[in-house]
Amino acid sequence: MHIFIFNNASRAANYGIGTYVRLLSDGLLGRSGVKVSFVDMFSDVKEYSIADDERGCRHYQVPALFSGMENEPYCRNVFYFLARHIKAEDDERLVFHFNYFQHKPLASLLKGQYFDCRIVFTVHYLGWCFELKGNKTRFRELIAEGYQPKDDKERGLLAGVENEKEFLHLADEVIVLSKDTQQILAEGYGVSSDKMHLVYNGLGDGLCFDKDKNVGNGRIILFVGRLDEIKGLNYLIHAFRHIADKYADIRLVVAGDGDFQLYLSQCRDLQGRVSFLGKVSSSEVEDVYRSAYIGVMPSFHEQCSYTAIEMMRHKIPLIGTDTTGLAEMLDATPELRVSIDEDNMMDEEFTERLVSCLNLLLSDEDAYQRAADAVGKLYEARYKVSDMVHATCGVMESSWDRPDYTVSPDYLKHIDSRMIQLINQCPDIDTDFYGMGGIGVYLWKRVLDLCDRKEGDFQASLILEHLIYYMDWVQDVVGSSPLPVELWAMIRSMGQHGFYKTCVNALLVRQSGSDTLFQMPSDRVIINVVLNVFR
């Protein structure tokens, strides 16, 4: 199995996604029969290049374009670069592992080029979570049937959801990092449950903590993360201010980069009690965690935070919110889970809840120790890197176990829409099976399949309506020229089912060899053809 991992040399690559890619690839390299290569998008190189790293992994390096980092032309150029160099052996199983929604055009092209490959997508984020600060109630309102967006912001958000949905439907396997995301994708994105796999992020393979933590220099309350509004640091600063006089030995340490000025101004009355470390290097981060007494993540959105896992691994009691994926990371310590009221968020009430959790851990040593032990046990049960690698590799390997598999059933409606769009456009394309013929053969085969399932009635009716336009298009273009055998087989099948008799019968009469029988191509051949029509 040859796994191509797609990554970005971007800000996110220096945070959670970059950590995930590094740990996953390190683990996969130790597995028998697995080869790992990287496609490094937006790389700091001047031209397309190929290089091997010290581990023997091949890197396909793609330079940045100032005109747009990941727009469709950029992805198409990357595809042509990869198609020249990736040559699949007859028995080699190819996995293209994506981590960014912006790469959807590239994934679609690769699926058409390497039909037997598997597209695996790991969901590290959902765009609307940043815009709506993880508010699932508001998200459900926006995607409700019949909802009309009120402004450009809402229209842009919904367009982003549709883009994410198409990629998730295209993917053969979808890896989610939390149960919460699994539910959102099932209910809000229509992703089939049989291709979704819950695999928690993993870090290390054992606890890493001091049994006798030295708090002689004071008890440190630690925040680690980007200095973005969605991380909720301002609430933590307000909460710290409430308790600073009560506990003279506590300090707040903030590790991460971003807009320092905004938060420094909030700490003017806390001089000497709050420290901003900036972005901490990998060589220093261990000391930061070892010195921490309590961790706080007042975030409005997380998937499966490596910061939270690192705190668990060091047996640091963690105070967090009940938002998205963070809630289940606090399963072992529900008393430290701070509720976010999505319908009526009150800043003061939220701050008071943070204060209550901080007071519990700072004033009750037994409660503190119970929480420390609980998070350590949860880490060992759920968040070890060996478990993550084993489960992810299992998802990829088992993807070939489905008999007669061609493409994700979720994706068929998107193919339908693309074929219908081509019918409406009537482009100047060849009439053979790899052009006009493939469009009709695919849609007619879809109708036959949908008619066998009651839930497919609406979609079948939509396709049949456009097949009428399609047959008129064929009649205009083909004239008396011989029909491709695949198109001929489709028209014969239409005649047998009594579809659009006037046009179909006219074509049957006009075509020579009407007594010759041809078989419709197999599903595998048809899907392969229409995926390439997408190009």
Where are these regions (language model features)?
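Conserved donor-binding/catalytic core segment of Leloir-type glycosyltransferases
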Residues: 175, 214-231, 237-240, 253
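Short hydrophobic beta-strand element within catalytic cores of glycosyltransferases
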Residues: 317-320, 327
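Carbohydrate-associated surface elements
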Residues: 180, 202
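Membrane-proximal helix-turn-helix segments that form the acceptor-binding/catalytic region
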Residues: 127, 142-174
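Short alpha-helical donor nucleotide-sugar binding micro-motif in glycosyltransferases
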Residues: 279, 287-292
